[in-house]
Each structure stands twice: as C-alpha cells, then as structure tokens.
C-alpha cells in the first residue's frame, strides 16, 4: 500500500458526518452509568477522508472527540471524474466491502456507513456492496481500507515505467 497519509489539516475545509452513535451502559454498585460512543467520518469532498471514534459521557462531547480523532487519521484517495479508478475489495473483521467504478450519472449506490465515507471523499458515482457484518465500525474501517488501497493510473504507470496509455490499453 502506498503512503497516502495526509500530514497537515490546517488548510483543509473538512466536513464531518456522524455515522453511528451508541449508548453504552456500565452497571455499578450505585446504579447504571451511561456513556456514548460516536463514529464520525470527515472529508473535504475532494479526495481526502478520515474516520474517528469518540467516547464521552455526553453525545456532543463524543462527536467532538470523534471529529478530532478523524482529523488525525486522514488519507488521500485518487478520485477521477467523480468515481474510483478500479474495483477494490477489502475486509475488516467480519465486514467485507466491494467498491466498483460507475459511469457518470449512476450516483452513490451504497448503504449506511459506506455511503457516508464515499460521499465524504467526494465520490459521486460508485457501486458498493457489503457482505458479512453490518456493524458500522467494521464497515467504515473496511471502506477506508478499500479506498486506501486504490492506485491512480498515473501511479501504476510510474511504478511500471510505462506510459499512462499503456496502462489502459494493455
């Protein structure tokens, strides 16, 4: 996998999306204690995306912590004409994700947690399928893993030492 981490977030205009919020109950001798866990995806809708998990006693604090964690976990994704350059399969835990490029006008054909990640990165046309676990934690991580493994045609051509046209035509 190529080094596609984003170093600085100062000049980026990141938009955050809440994927899931989970109320956790801890039973103690004195009664029940409630806390919240929030999965957040941030992206600039131009090829940069990240995810974070925030935990706190209040929902708003958990979301804020998730956003800060997501800003520390950004990757660069090659987006070409609103779609991805090639098909990609990735797994995380019990979740398996397949993302495929789609022609212009198709839209984002993905469900739940995958849709939030794909729209945050700025992909407008893609076909996505999830198998196995539908746990939002694992779906977000598997989708980010699939996007992280994508390579642009220019990178492939440079690694092979051939022209970009040769990559497309074989």
Curated annotation (Swiss-Prot):
Part of the 30S ribosomal subunit. Contacts proteins S4 and S8. GO terms for biological process: translation. Keywords: Ribonucleoprotein, Ribosomal protein, RNA-binding, rRNA-binding. Residues 14-77 form the S5 DRBM domain. It comes from the Bacteria. Signal peptide: none annotated. This is Small ribosomal subunit protein uS5. SUPFAM superfamilies: dsRNA-binding domain-like, Ribosomal protein S5 domain 2-like. The keyword Iron-sulfur does not apply. The keyword Metal-binding does not apply. One of its GO terms (cellular component) is small ribosomal subunit. With S4 and S12 plays an important role in translational accuracy. Located at the back of the 30S subunit body where it stabilizes the conformation of the head with respect to the body. The N-terminal domain interacts with the head of the 30S subunit; the C-terminal domain interacts with the body and contacts protein S4. The interaction surface between S4 and S5 is involved in control of translational fidelity. HAMAP family: Ribosomal_uS5_B. GO terms for molecular function: rRNA binding; structural constituent of ribosome. Belongs to the universal ribosomal protein uS5 family.
């Amino acid at each position: 996998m190529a080094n596609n981490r984003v170093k600085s977030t100062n000049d980026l205009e990141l938009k955050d999306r809440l994927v899931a919020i989970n109320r956790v109950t801890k039973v103690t001798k004195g009664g029940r204690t409630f806390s919240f866990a929030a999965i957040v995806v941030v992206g600039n809708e131009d090829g940069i995306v990240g995810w974070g998990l925030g935990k706190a006693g209040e929902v708003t604090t958990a979301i804020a912590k998730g956003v800060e964690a997501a800003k520390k976990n950004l990757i660069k994704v090659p987006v070409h004409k609103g779609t991805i350059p090639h098909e990609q399969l990735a797994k995380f835990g019990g979740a398996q994700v397949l993302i495929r490029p789609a022609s212009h006008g198709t839209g984002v054909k993905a469900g739940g947690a995958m849709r939030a990640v794909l729209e945050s990165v700025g992909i407008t046309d893609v076909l996505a399928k999830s198998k196995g676990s539908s746990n939002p934690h694992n779906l977000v991580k598997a989708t980010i893993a699939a996007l992280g493994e994508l390579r642009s045609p220019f990178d492939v051509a440079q690694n092979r030492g051939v022209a970009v046209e040769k990559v497309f035509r074989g």
